[in-house]
Each structure stands twice: as structure tokens, then as C-alpha cells.
Amino acid sequence: MQTFQADLAIVGAGGAGLRAAIAAAQANPNAKIALISKVYPMRSHTVAAEGGSAAVAQDHDSFEYHFHDTVAGGDWLCEQDVVDYFVHHCPTEMTQLELWGCPWSRRPDGSVNVRRFGGMKIERTWFAADKTGFHMLHTLFQTSLQFPQIQRFDEHFVLDILVDDGHVRGLVAMNMMEGTLVQIRANAVVMATGGAGRVYRYNTNGGIVTGDGMGMALSHGVPLRDMEFVQYHPTGLPGSGILMTEGCRGEGGILVNKNGYRYLQDYGMGPETPLGEPKNKYMELGPRDKVSQAFWHEWRKGNTISTPRGDVVYLDLRHLGEKKLHERLPFICELAKAYVGVDPVKEPIPVRPTAHYTMGGIETDQNCETRIKGLFAVGECSSVGLHGANRLGSNSLAELVVFGRLAGEQATERAATAGNGNEAAIEAQAAGVEQRLKDLVNQDGGENWAKIRDEMGLAMEEGCGIYRTPELMQKTIDKLAELQERFKRVRITDTSSVFNTDLLYTIELGHGLNVAECMAHSAMARKESRGAHQRLDEGCTERDDVNFLKHTLAFRDADGTTRLEYSDVKITTLPPAKRVYGGEADAADKAEAANKKEKANG
């Protein structure tokens, strides 16, 4: 097994991983940085993000407003000190991206343009047409090429991390092009591996988003936090799950049922706004969890449209006009034509909620470090405490760069002070990784990884979807336990050493099953409804701050069982209150302003 010596290893070369690598290179120009990715960096899932990235940019906006929107949007399960750090650093990172070449869309006067996004009181979403993720990733990738100390290991699949006496010491990866193993020694490792959306049947995620980093951390005793909170995006294309960005609604698109009725006004997000005049926190610009839940209610009422690919509602953009659509949403027009045969200029787009984002992830502190010294996690694979029970759109792209930078700087500092590990113990671990791989390749049985993966996706959709019941969640838990047993009998039929996808998909499935069990058990144990976790059983349909204003921590014990613990939520300045949107939110804002004025007048 070849060995490469580095100071810092970063797993994942999407937005978070690239930003961490750049920050590390800037913090210590002499540091050797290994950047490992199972795909070429520009194929990372960040490239699929369309809508935008949040940062205060206008005089009538403020850090306080962004903080409030994020905490309320997360249904008060956010770590408020983390949110405060985040909102204050977003503008700096957006400006830095521009200095590196990110082509933010502009107003006629040359100032940066910002669009409305759901759950936000004021428009603060920076965007580059409707390919924001692509432009951010391209900017970060080309910037990273300026630093020769960043050595890329493209198309390398990380099999496991190496840990000695509570401190990370490196990792073992497979060179997918050759089928050989490489040991990368480093005294700090940053996980930037993305979410776990592929454990669901229909999702907006790329094929690489399989929960690998979460699974590796879990196997070393690091808990996954708040895994019951999985966001459904309200507007995915039926069948494919391809995303129709929230920017569509930010520009003025509307959602209608089979009767042409704008149904969101019936679910606490009204009154109805004028056509083509979107209003922050109203109607289509409500938070994603509530907009997705409204679809479910319309489906139950029989107000959705039946199609061969499932029930849908319509996203109508026609009133925006051809010029605006081709200027602001050109990619959306292309996608709608290619995947559902619809020209948004002339017809409404069929959409339905689709699994989109993992709010939970690898538990970290406010500096992105886990319980294992030197092991950091950032981006969607992590739970730093930013999103709580429901993420606001455009906060995630900003999270990649704000916390990517922080993780890179902190990991560089940790690596410089780590000392040396037990060489014999580390080598023994690496040999163990190699042996487990051989055992998997030679495993005998009649099971097929693809069939197990499909059954997992269906089970997660049925039991851990938009609305949940104890019966369906238990059915999912039982099914996952069955699939875990069947996974032990998966047979790998491809014997090649070069790009053996049969082997790689099997390894991904193993991580996915472990992560899915954390999601299902965490959901069953949270006997309340909060954010993206909504229950229908009696006594659990409302938020319960007395018993469940706390984080769920899911551990995987040595015998394969999922064990749950809980930790407190950090509340600093904004105590829990009712989440309100639409006219109710305006009334609450007016009452708060009047109260402040009265106090000021003494």
C-alpha cells in the first residue's frame, strides 16, 4: 500500500472542501494539503445548486433580521451562537467570491442583485442567474489551482479514517482508476462529503451523495445529530427529482392546484399576493417545510393532478414573460423542456415535493471539530447547528464558504500541534481496512446491492417522508434491519480492478443503511412535530419545547444497534416563539414594533 504524507487531508472537493483547502493553504503556506474526491471536483454536487447564497447586502436589511429568519426558520433548534457567527461572516465570503471571479448578477446601477427566498423577511439571496452553485464551484476550483501545496487525489474513494488514541491520523483511499490503495497520513482530516439524500427513492441529489462521511464518522463513535430532519423541497420534477429552484418563486412564480387555485393561502401563508408581485414570507415564499406540507394536504383533499410519475401541482411562471424567464431562469427553462417536455413560457411546470437536504449530520462544535481530535466536518455532511429543524433556502451555499473557511483554518492549526501517533497501531488499522475490503470482495451470497438500495429508498420515503406515523416509522425500522442482514450476503460480481462500480456502490450502500437507521430511529423517538419532522399521531402533532427542545444524538454501537442520546440547544438572544408567516407574521412584526416604541417612550 502506497503512503502519502500530508499535514491536512480534506475528503470531498465540492464547495466546502475547496474553501477549506484554500483557507488552509492561506493560513499555512508550508502545509501539505491532500484534497481527496471520488469525482472530478467540478462534478461535485455543489454544481447542482441553482438559486443563490444568502448574505446581508441592503441598507434596510440587518444581521439581526438574518439571524431571526434563520432561527425561526429552523423552529428554534439552531445553535444561536453558530447562527450569529454565520450571518456576520456571510457578506465577507460573498465579496471574497466576487474578488476571485464569481459573476454575481447585477442591477442596472452595477450593485449586486439579490432575490427573494422562502422564509426570509428581506431579499438577501445573491445569485448568478440560476446557476449559482456552478459559478461558485468554478470560482473556488480555479482559485484552488493557484496553491501548489494542494495536491488533488481525484477519483479516489475514501474507505476509512485512521484514528489513534482519540486523534485522527489519516485515512485509506482506493484509487478508482487503478484499483490500488493509498494511505494518506495527516494529523487533521476535514470531512466535506455532502449529505445523504440518496437513501430516499426520489431526491434532488446527485448519485455521489450517499452519506459516506457520515457513515465513516459514525463507525468511529462520532454521533450523527438531528438526523430525523430531512428537508423536502416543494418543487422537484416528478420521477427524476430534478430541482426547480426556489428562485422561480423568488422571481414571482406561483403554485396552483388542479383548480388553478393558489392553495398556500389556506395553510398560514396568505393572504394571496398580487400576481407577479412576490412578497417576503408570504405564499410561495413561505419556508420549505410548510410549503411541502401544504402539498401533502392538497393531495389528501384530492386537489392535486395525477400523472404517470405521481401526483403533482403546477408551478406557473407564464406571467413573468419570456424576456424575464430567459434572463433570470434560463437553466430552468432548459430543464423543464428536457425532462417534462414543458416550455415554462407557455405552460405551467408539474412539480411535487422531493427529498432534498439533510439538516442533520456529523456532530461538531462551533469550530467544526468532532469528538475525535483533528477530525472536522463541514457542509451538508455536518451538523454545526446552523439549520435546526428546517434549513432556509440559500443558507446552505453560504454555509459552505463561511464554515469551509473556518474548518480549513482550524484544521491547519490542529495539525500543527498534534504530535506523532503510534506508528504500529496506525499501520495495523490500515491493514485492517485492506482486509475488510478483501472480505467484501470475496463475500458469498445471492443478494444484489441495487435491489437492497431500491428497497431502502422506498422504505425511507414511506416511513420518514413529509408526514410520519409510529406505524410507518416502525415498518421502516424493521425493513432497514432486514436489509442490514441481507447486506451481509451481497455478492460483488464485477472482478475488475479499474472503476469497479459494483464494489463502490456496495460500500456506499453500507454507509447509506447505517445513516438511514439513524434517521428512522431518531424520528421515532422525537414525539413532537417540529420543522421537517411532522407526526400525525395523537399527542405529537404540535411542537413540544418542554420535552424536545433538544438535539438528538444517534450512535451506532459495536453490535450494530442504534443508540440515542440528547444534548441541549444553545439559546442566546431569541427565546422560542411561534413560527408565523404571511399576514400573521406582519401582524406580529407590527405588535413587536409598537411594543419597542412603547418601552422607548417609557
From Swiss-Prot:
**Which positions in this protein are listed as binding FAD?**
12-16, 36-38, 44-52, 156-158, 192-193, 212, 356-357, 380, 391-397
Q: How does it sit in the membrane?
A: Peripheral membrane protein
The entry's keywords:
Cell inner membrane, Cell membrane, Electron transport, FAD, Flavoprotein, Membrane, Nucleotide-binding, Oxidoreductase, Transport
Q: Which Gene3D superfamilies match?
A: FAD/NAD(P)-binding domain, Fumarate reductase/succinate dehydrogenase flavoprotein-like, C-terminal domain, succinate dehydrogenase protein domain, Succinate dehydrogenase/fumarate reductase flavoprotein, catalytic domain
Q: What is the annotated localization of this protein?
A: Cell inner membrane
User: For the modification Tele-8alpha-FAD histidine, which residues carry it?
Assistant: H45
Q: Which GO terms describe its molecular function?
A: electron transfer activity; FAD binding; flavin adenine dinucleotide binding; succinate dehydrogenase (quinone) activity; succinate dehydrogenase activity
Family the UniProt entry places it in: Belongs to the FAD-dependent oxidoreductase 2 family. FRD/SDH subfamily.
Q: How does it assemble?
A: Part of an enzyme complex containing four subunits: a flavoprotein (FrdA), an iron-sulfur protein (FrdB), and two hydrophobic anchor proteins (FrdC and FrdD). Can be cross-linked to SdhE. Purified from membrane fractions associated with protoporphyrinogen IX dehydrogenase (hemG).
Q: What is this protein called?
A: Fumarate reductase flavoprotein subunit
Its taxonomic path starts at: Bacteria, Pseudomonadati, Pseudomonadota, Gammaproteobacteria, Enterobacterales
